[in-house]
Amino acid sequence: MIKLKSVIDAVIIRTDGFRIYKDPEKMALIRHYANTTGIIILTDSDTAGFRIRRYLKGAVGSGKITNVYIPDIFGKEKRKDAPSKEGKLGVEGIDNSILIECFAKAGIDISGEGANYVPPEDPITRMDMFELGLSGGSDSSAKRKMLLAHYGLPELLTTNGIVEVLNTMITREELYTAAEKLFDNMEDR
């Protein structure tokens, strides 16, 4: 994912391999993006990668999908002790220049010139998470779970992931309003 973040400015949702099959919250998030902004599916070029790609395409339904395919490049990734089962490099193992070429072949402009995402004027930050008690407090974990459930997001999202996703879904003001409603009765319990 680190390599991918250096190539494209987008919300990146890891499927964690076949775990996506049993993660309805993460699938709900993927469907949300497919039906609003559209999604890009980028998987390894091995059998498992294509099986996951087919599953995502079927699970998303009528949402907008753009497929990006990496070429079959054989070798061993530096971060691994042995080659993969099929001997192919995965997304994290190929050069950035090849990744950029793959996006271009799929018609995706990652230069920023043609991007239609407009960052929020008043973005949600980690400080907001702290001020709302979503991080740094004794009940922060419970509050995060409530907020994530409210928005139908996977509960395993990190604080940084929550900030990134919420900035594409809601405004800072909407976050504060939701938090006030969700957490208002917590002290009464």
What is each of the regions a protein language model found here?
Residues 1, 48, 70-74:
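Conserved structured catalytic cores and adjacent interaction surfaces
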Residues 1-2, 6-36:
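Acidic, glycine-rich catalytic loops of TOPRIM or P-loop NTPase phosphate-binding modules used
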Residues 11-14, 39-42, 66-67:
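Short hydrophobic alpha-helical runs that function as membrane-insertion/retention elements
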Residues 23, 48-51:
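Short glycine/serine/threonine-rich phosphate/pyrophosphate-binding segments
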Residues 34-48:
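Acidic beta-strand-to-loop metal/phosphate-binding motif
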Residues 50-59:
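Short Gly/Thr/Asp-enriched flexible loops that form oxyanion-binding sites at enzyme active sites
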Residues 70-132:
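Activity-critical C-terminal alpha-helical subdomain
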Residues 101, 113-189:
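C-terminal, charge/polar-rich interaction regions
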